[in-house]
């Protein structure tokens, strides 16, 4: 069975977006995203696709698969494959993952395809255990942004909540998104050029850490 991952960036409050965009500028996160996903199919919703500047889409070195209710069957458009549902996207990702790619696979090549947004696509993918060809999302890569007290960043889109395992390696009760453990976490760093943008337009200092989680 193919292995499916999800990747996103979030504040410590779980914010991943505001007004159809990301309330930050994070060059380190963009570089990490490229490193992780390069060479693998990426699955996204229409709004995520449209949030990329036209000069950056399709994302190079990756099969771009866009989910949109505006199509009833798969069709090629603007350098991407447009499909009507998450299930259709996963079948397309399976087919693409089994074909040679021009780009060099990322260091996390154990993941065959990535979910990259937006909120509703993450929510459906993380909560399901019957995803065609993949079963369920098994890996999450997330960039965690720390907001200094008094500089909290607000937004209208949140990341899926992931329940972390206790010291015994299990989770109490049940969670719709399953039980997870952190397998790697980088030290906190202060971004030299990046910033978190509050609703007033003020640029606030950005501290970030990269985390990898695996489903138990």
Model-derived regions: residue spans:
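Enzymes that bind and transform nitrogen-containing heteroaromatic metabolites
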Residues: 1-216
């Amino acid at each position: 069975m193919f292995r499916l991952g999800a990747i996103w960036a979030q504040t410590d409050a779980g914010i991943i977006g505001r007004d159809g965009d990301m309330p930050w500028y994070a060059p380190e996160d963009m570089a990490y995203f490229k490193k992780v996903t390069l060479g693998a199919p990426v699955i996204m919703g229409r709004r995520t696709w449209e949030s990329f500047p036209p000069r950056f889409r399709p994302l190079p070195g990756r099969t771009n698969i866009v989910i949109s209710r505006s199509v009833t069957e798969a069709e090629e458009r603007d350098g991407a494959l447009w499909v009507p549902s998450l299930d259709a996207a996963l079948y397309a990702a399976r087919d693409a993952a089994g074909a040679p790619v021009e780009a060099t696979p990322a260091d996390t090549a154990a993941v065959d395809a990535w979910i990259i947004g937006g909120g509703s696509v993450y929510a459906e993918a993380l909560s399901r255990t019957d995803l065609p060809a993949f079963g369920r999302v098994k890996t999450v890569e997330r960039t965690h942004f720390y907001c200094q007290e008094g500089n909290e960043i607000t937004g209208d889109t949140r990341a899926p909540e992931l329940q972390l395992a206790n010291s015994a390696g299990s989770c109490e009760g049940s969670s719709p998104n399953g039980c997870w453990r952190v397998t790697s976490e980088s030290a906190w760093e202060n971004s030299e050029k990046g910033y978190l943008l509050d609703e007033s337009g003020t640029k606030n200092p950005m501290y970030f850490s990269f985390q990898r989680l695996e489903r138990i």
